[in-house]
Amino acid sequence: MLKRKNYVNNISPLFTPPKGDKRRPAFINYALEQAKKIDVARSELNYILKLRDPKTGSIIPRHRQLNEHRAAAMRVIVPAMIYHFNITSDLVQASIEQLADECGLSTVSKSGNKSITRASRLISQFMEPMGFIKCKKKWDKILGCYMPKIIMLTPLFFELIGISKEKLNNAKKQQLGWLNTKLIERGLKPLSFSDAKLVSREKQINKILELRNNFHLLQRKKRYAKKLFKLDEKDIRQKIIKYLVSKYSSSELAQISLQEFKKQVNIEYFYLRNLANEPYLISRR
């Protein structure tokens, strides 16, 4: 009988932090050390908790533990999420693609197409239904596609590595206090938890928007931009305004000045105009 061939590209993935990155807060370093001590893929929580549909809350039938390849993926993606975790906002400040790349879970075919399926399925089919993380994705009305998911870590995620909700909350308070001390030193107003979450979310959305330079999306964006710029400038700007308004809640919009909002509209307008006028696309090297 023939031995079954491995159906994953990297049977021993390893998380490699980005080079030249900033020093991590003490709590993050502590959490990373905890993750080294515990086999998160075989945690008791994985057997006690039930998979639930994130949208409906209904139980998803499950008949076996994680297979070894998915378990290996979980063992590396957990420390990657911790490394990129923003303590005050609960956000993982990295996309699924970035996590997959840093963990050796992405592959590139001979034709040059990248696949992050191994990481994305672990997240959507296990970690989110188990309640370890929450994911949000927004429809990009300008480009006609979804933005990369925004990932948030829940207290249950930290229970995986033996960190209690109380210890997590204490770390949040300490980190916000440190952040506000720095702001006061610069003559700025201190932030509440909700303010800090808003600031972090803005940074995350801006980071996601930077991913627009990804070659795999450029052709689709270019087609849309060409179609859009057949309209009058007034109509184009109106569509951009509707898109930007949809990104924020009413309370968040109230905190953005008219001048800043106009600036965002102009940035979006000129970005799309340049894309529409670009004569050709240069493939990745």
Curated annotation (Swiss-Prot):
Species classification: Bacteria, Pseudomonadati, Pseudomonadota, Gammaproteobacteria, Enterobacterales
Name of protein: Probable replication-associated protein repA1
A GO biological process held by the record: plasmid maintenance
Keyword flag Zinc: no
Keyword Nucleotide-binding set for record: no
Family: Belongs to the IncFII RepA family.
Keywords associated with the record: DNA replication, Plasmid, Plasmid copy control
One Pfam family from the record: IncFII_repA
Function: This protein is essential for plasmid replication; it is involved in copy control functions.
